[in-house]
Amino acid sequence: MWGERTHHHKHEHHKHEQHAHFPSGSSKEPKFIADSYSSVDEVIGALREAGLESSNLILGIDFTKSNEWSGRHSFGRKSLHAISGTPNPYEQAISIIGRTLSPFDDDNLIPCFGFGDASTHDHSVFSFYQENRPCRGFEEVLERYRQIVPHLNLSGPTSFAPLIYAAMSVVESSNWQYHVLVIIADGQVTTTNSSDRRLSPQEQATIQAIVDASFYPLSIVMVGVGDGPWDAMQHFDDCIPDRAFDNFQFVNFTDIMSTRKDMSKKEAAFALAALMEIPTQYKATQGLRPSEYLFFFLCILY
């Protein structure tokens, strides 16, 4: 009915001493982006003005069990994956991100993965289509999402690691083109309940995956939908050791969309919050020399 499960194991590699080389003193340096826009179109213009030239989108959707109750306050007690005449939070986020990044996507092909259902749990992902076929544009993403949701058994626990490694494989197969992985999820990575706040296996795996991904031309944007809590994700960056560049950002979709503004301004605010760091990260990945990608890839192989 949809794509087969795909296992993406942790890449074993040596310690890396190389770091991103940032362009300096150049007219191509990312420019400051203001924080008030009235429409998604204005945000698109701001991203282009700030230096974003090309970006390919990868989407990852959370199908863990908590989606059934995480909309108690923010989505009228309905499942966050409820399909009806009113777009659910996942559909809203997909649409806004898709509309914002599509002008920068040359082929408009969007690889889409699901995770956290009863077939994948925290150890693999599934593609929306067989043989990992991408969707053509965000409109097909939404159409395919609506088709598969009724047939999924929500489960867990939550780990972003398999999804991040799947995105890294997409980057490899694209000849190392720059991509943005947008993870839309209703909850943070599964934590332990221990008083000494030890990291759970899912947190450890996700942190390692984010570090590994920083050696790829790949930005990761985590979009939080539903009631949360989000305290751990908001401080997640602090737990991540040195990376080739700062490649992870969390955005609270619910907080932004619950403000008292008209819808076009809320959509613009969300698009900006999710993507305002992308021009800087795009430039950082351009600074990573191809030889550094090759070195990292060889470390994975050997």
Q: What are these language model-derived features?
A:
Residues 1-302:
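Acidic, low-complexity intrinsically disordered regions
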